[in-house]
């Protein structure tokens, strides 16, 4: 009798685990194949508006940069600002968004907008990593919670994206 109850108990646990794993797989799959949720879009738009207001108050200029959410990043790079043929574009990594949306909103968007501002103002330094003192100040002024360099100089892109 005890053996039968124990067997039923373990089978129940296995069934619950399989259901849990199936649900996680399904959620990950649907997130990957669909556009980001509207709640994410709103958070990105709200943060962008906050950054534009800070840009206007600190620098007397305000300009929007296209923000593209993509799953084409090869690594765990959170964001990237590309400057090519005079055009600036910010790319955000969809692959890390689900687990790090707060970080993306609190730090990454302003971090990337700081690069865009430095490009636009013509303050690019001779540093190859794109994280000069001017950039650091811009990052702080645009409201990033954390203005640190997260890539090494080999990963910085000036017109060449790490994906196709």
Task: Give the positions of each predicted feature.
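Active-site recognition of the HExxH zinc-binding catalytic motif
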Residues: 107-120
